[in-house]
Swiss-Prot record:
HAMAP family: Sulf_adenylyltr_sub1. It comes from Salmonella typhimurium (strain LT2 / SGSC1412 / ATCC 700720). It comes from the Bacteria. GO terms for molecular function: ATP binding; GTP binding; GTPase activity; sulfate adenylyltransferase (ATP) activity. This is Sulfate adenylyltransferase subunit 1. Pathway: Sulfur metabolism; hydrogen sulfide biosynthesis; sulfite from sulfate: step 1/3. It catalyses: sulfate + ATP + H(+) = adenosine 5'-phosphosulfate + diphosphate. The lineage of its organism: Bacteria, Pseudomonadati, Pseudomonadota, Gammaproteobacteria, Enterobacterales.
Amino acid sequence: MNTILAQQIANEGGVEAWMIAQQHKSLLRFLTCGSVDDGKSTLIGRLLHDTLQIYEDQLSSLHNDSKRHGTQGEKLDLALLVDGLQAEREQGITIDVAYRYFSTERRKFIIADTPGHEQYTRNMATGASTCDLAILLIDARKGVLDQTRRHSFISTLLGIKHLVVAINKMDLVDYREETFARIREDYLTFAEQLPGDLDIRFVPLSALEGDNVAAQSANMRWYSGPTLLEVLETVDIQRAVDRQPMRFPVQYVNRPNLDFRGYAGTLASGSVKVGERIKVLPSGVESSVARIVTFDGDKEEACAGEAITLVLNDDIDISRGDLLLAANETLAPARHAAIDVVWMAEQPLAPGQSYDVKLAGKKTRARIEAIRYQIDINNLTQRDVESLPLNGIGLVEMTFDEPLALDIYQQNPVTGGLIFIDRLSNVTVGAGMVRELDERGATPPVEYSAFELELNALVRRHFPHWDARDLLGDKHGAA
């Protein structure tokens, strides 16, 4: 067993008290990215090692693996703690996104170790999509490279506002301050092309030797700033969703018996209270919240990120994929949008193609109308293209088969982010972030006759397996 963990449990007064203390710690999700062989996996291994998060059997296994696959001579190869795939160990690189978990007395952490190679851009984008902070590793011998710029751009494209530029392998440049200062200046010059609201910090370190990772380095007394771990423990993460209006995508209609009907999902943004008036999109029908049900019992109020079940005061038709928001909020469903796309399939994305798209719990179809440009992610220039290749990133104009309630991705990643699904293989082939909305093409409400409404209700009541939708919600049944 991890001896430091055992000591922490003893200090808290037992396992139950320790688990309660863990629940009240804040959580930081971050990723490590950079060029090939910059030391990303080694850095994560060093963080786990120096925060005493490695169990004794893991340490013993690491000694054996270092002898077989290690690249550090007689020293422990800490990268092997993270590089789990056989192909990764044989090549000495990271291919897949590897997730690791650790905690300190101040915070809990989820780490995503992402690949540095350009052909694995899609893996890196997947890792970045759920993170709050990015650690960009730079080899002190090489300085700012194209892949550094590429990963910086992808991180900011996916909404990450906190960047920590970790200038690694300072031991190989004799810990020179002028090397650190030059790379810092080069990166700041490049960062002028990135969004202006970023929090960028610089830390000189050596992941192999442990300098400035979890403890201050005696070899770089000229650096008076915090260690990398101190930055991670103290960075103030202000999530945009906390300040955004209430959005609740319905994931599941929970009806265990005739006396209960609730709508389950995760509150994407804002907050909701018992008694609050809400509106359902796309139907526009209003009601009020009767109960907020959670695993731990009913609550009076829920905040962004909480998994809840809402019970309403009125019996109205709500299905998976519908969006609940405050009754006084205005969000016009749109059929046309400009989407930043990260393409993940071998077959290029081209105008005229159609795909299934999934947004939160909503699934529909969309057609690619045009590709405005592809971004050269090595120098951030835009160029005209006829198609978007594997790992390509570009701005694409799309039309949806039905109006969707969308937000701009930078404001709300849940209701502004979507995935592309191949209809035949059901494989995810791309990720999209809403950049612009065009509400002019929204379909006007359709007026149905009383007979049509009665027939629709009859079909939904007696033939539920047809999965017919409520016409009042502008949803058309499908056999």
